[in-house]
């Protein structure tokens, strides 16, 4: 069971249950039995697991556990594939990929989380998906992310791809943006109900 992973992804990361259910059903995330870490699986074009990264479900003093499973192939990343789609959207972290998919309700495009700012997983993904012609970079809006986006954009434009860079509207990354948007929506909802209660009391 994924009780702690669900609690972490829904409450801390503000992802919808619908999206988390989708990734669980696709066997792209699971929970370790011993420490209850959430595990993100990267599969190849045949569906074979090639990569797995772990994230602690409890933030101890602001320093959550992060790590890769032993014998990982880092040229694979956490991904969503659609052979009929000609674009891949690239993120640094798995949770950012999930956050974007949740916020935009985007279940159609190819999506890939590099696990860092290194583009080795993108090279592999493009090799396995020759139909892709467009790359959209959704890396973090920080110094490292902006630098990586510029370098990756230049490299793949020279290889003949159409490349765009798209940072979140605000915040450092797509999960930070999603969390802020969801909390803002809750506050607006509570304020509307509070105003309605006042009007009814006055009436």
Locations of regions flagged by a protein language model:
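Phosphate-handling DNA/RNA-contact segment within nucleic-acid enzymes
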Residues: 33-128
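TOPRIM fold recognition
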Residues: 102-203
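Electropositive nucleic-acid engagement tracts
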Residues: 5-35
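Short, solvent-exposed polar/charged micro-motifs at secondary-structure junctions
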Residues: 28-33, 62, 173-178
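Generic structural signal for bulky hydrophobic/aromatic residues embedded
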Residues: 12-14, 43, 103, 177
């Amino acid at each position: 069971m994924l009780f702690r992973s669900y609690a972490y992804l829904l409450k801390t990361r503000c992802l919808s249950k619908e999206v988390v259910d989708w990734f669980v059903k696709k066997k792209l995330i699971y929970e370790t039995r011993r420490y209850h870490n959430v595990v993100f699986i990267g599969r190849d074009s045949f569906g074979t697991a090639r990569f797995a990264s772990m994230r602690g479900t409890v933030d101890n003093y602001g320093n959550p556990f992060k790590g890769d499973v032993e014998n990982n192939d880092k040229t694979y990343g956490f991904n969503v594939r659609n052979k009929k789609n000609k674009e891949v959207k690239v993120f640094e972290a798995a949770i950012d990929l999930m956050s974007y998919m949740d916020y935009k309700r985007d279940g159609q495009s190819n999506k890939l989380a590099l696990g860092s700012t290194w583009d080795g997983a993108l090279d592999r993904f493009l090799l396995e998906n020759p139909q892709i012609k467009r790359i959209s970079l959704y890396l973090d809006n920080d110094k490292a992310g902006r630098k990586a986006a510029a370098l990756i954009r230049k490299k793949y434009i020279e290889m003949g791809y159409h490349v765009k860079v798209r940072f979140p509207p605000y915040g450092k990354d797509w999960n930070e943006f999603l969390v802020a948007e969801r909390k803002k929506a809750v506050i607006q909802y509570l304020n509307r109900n509070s105003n309605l209660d006042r009007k009814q009391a006055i009436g």
